[in-house]
Amino acid sequence: INQDWNYETTQFALNATAVFELTHAVLPGMIRRKTGAICNVGSAAGNIPIPNNATYVLTKAGVNAFTEALHYELKNTGVSCTLLAPGPVRDAVIPENEKSIVDKVVPDVLWTTYESCAKETLEAMAKNRRRVVPGPLSKAMNVVSSVAPTRVLSPVMGWFYKKMS
């Protein structure tokens, strides 16, 4: 509600418009050559209505649905499309004086490393998997969002995201 409009529109352009335009730019050539792989970065957060993070959720829900739909549309074309839905990703160890508010709010055990995220993603792409969810937090969010009622989950996630802002 009280978000910076410029920040929100920039976030939309980066998270949604750029994904759509870049996919559109490379896909025709891949289909013509009958080979290629697309990996779009969505989020487990795109599966849950999260107060205090509405624009992010909007963009990631769109990327999730767009990418997973393309995965099926591209069957038998030689082109694969995988959704990467990571949780928080960073270096394994961060000095205390360099930690952001997110680093301080999200416990270390819930982060995944760049290397681990990349390895899981490349393995999933090689197997033409529809979705890859690296990291403990995103795996948990993925499961919880499929079983917990929205009326319970959304307020909890909204509180958590508000702590990070």
Predicted regions and their residues:
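Alpha-helical segment proximal to the catalytic Tyr-Lys
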Residues: 28, 72-73
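SDR active-site lid
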Residues: 73-136
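Residue(s) in the substrate-gating loop at a strand-loop-helix junction
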Residues: 43
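Substrate-binding pocket helix/loop in short-chain dehydrogenase/reductase
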Residues: 1-9
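Active-site loop immediately N-terminal to the catalytic Tyr-X3-Lys motif
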Residues: 50-54
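Active-site helix of classical SDR
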Residues: 23, 59
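A short helix-coil junction within the Rossmann-fold of NAD(P)-dependent oxidoreductases
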Residues: 25-34
